[in-house]
């Protein structure tokens, strides 16, 4: 059995296959998944799993070079942003895009992870780094 916190097979597979510059999106329950992009649906009920728990589990395995957030997040300040601030040392450089442009960016993601999070704009694009 794996020793790291991340147990989801599909999510572990995607992370293991990511290379430098690849994108993984973690989204709230309402974020649309573009056609042709793999969706890893973790949502069970509203709020379960929450965005923060999924982000922490992903960061246990993924080396992140930078991350992208929607500008609208700064106005709404969902709990996800509080967790992102807490984890900023593991997230690399930050970039801001409009929510519409964030959705355009998600078209080039290796996968979109759908959480049960129901707070608006609780989405992040993680751009993979290297460990060497």
UniProtKB/Swiss-Prot annotation:
Annotated protein name in UniProt: D-ribose pyranase
Record's function text: Catalyzes the interconversion of beta-pyran and beta-furan forms of D-ribose.
Pathway as given in its UniProt record: Carbohydrate metabolism; D-ribose degradation; D-ribose 5-phosphate from beta-D-ribopyranose: step 1/2
One cellular component term from this protein's GO annotations in UniProt: cytosol
Catalytic residues of the enzyme: 20 (proton donor)
Domain of life: Bacteria
HAMAP family from the UniProt entry: D_rib_pyranase
Top-tier EC class: isomerase
One Pfam entry name: RbsD_FucU
Primary residence: cytoplasm
NCBIfam families named among the record's database cross-references: PRK11797.1
Coiled-coil portions: none
Keywords: Carbohydrate metabolism, Cytoplasm, Isomerase
Assembly and binders: Homodecamer.
Residues that coordinate or bind substrate: 28, 99, 121-123
Any single GO BP term: D-ribose catabolic process
Species in which this protein is naturally found: Pseudomonas putida (strain GB-1)
């Amino acid at each position: 059995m794996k020793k790291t916190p991340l147990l989801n097979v599909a999510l572990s597979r995607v992370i293991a296959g990511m290379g430098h510059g690849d994108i993984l999106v973690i989204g709230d329950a309402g974020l649309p998944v573009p056609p042709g992009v793999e969706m890893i649906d973790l949502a069970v009920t509203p709020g379960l799993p929450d965005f923060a728990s999924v982000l922490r589990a992903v960061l246990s395995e993924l080396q992140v070079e930078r991350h992208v957030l929607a500008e609208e997040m700064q106005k709404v300040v969902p709990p996800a942003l509080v967790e992102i601030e807490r984890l900023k040392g593991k997230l690399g450089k930050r970039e801001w895009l409009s929510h519409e442009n964030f959705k355009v960016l998600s078209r080039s993601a290796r996968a979109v992870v759908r959480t049960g999070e129901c707070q608006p704009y609780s989405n992040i694009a993680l751009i993979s780094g290297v460990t060497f």
